[in-house]
Amino acid sequence: ECGTLFSGCSTHADCCEGFICKLWCRYERTW
């Protein structure tokens, strides 16, 4: 599901290129 707004939302996703999920993955990785 790469390339969509919400791509990479799952916690096990290798692809975090969706705009929303870029922010989410960045947030998650600060833990």
Swiss-Prot record:
Disulfide bonds join 2-16, 9-21, 15-25. SUPFAM superfamilies: omega toxin-like (SSF57059). Expressed by the venom gland. Pfam families: Toxin_12. InterPro entries: Huwentoxin-1. Blocks transient outward voltage-gated potassium channels in rat ventricular myocytes (thus prolonging action-potential duration) and rat Kv4.2/KCNA4 channels expressed in Xenopus oocytes. Is also a weak blocker of calcium channels in rat cerebellar granule cells. Belongs to the neurotoxin 10 (Hwtx-1) family. 20 (HpTX3) subfamily. The presence of a 'disulfide through disulfide knot' structurally defines this protein as a knottin. This is Kappa-sparatoxin-Hv1c.
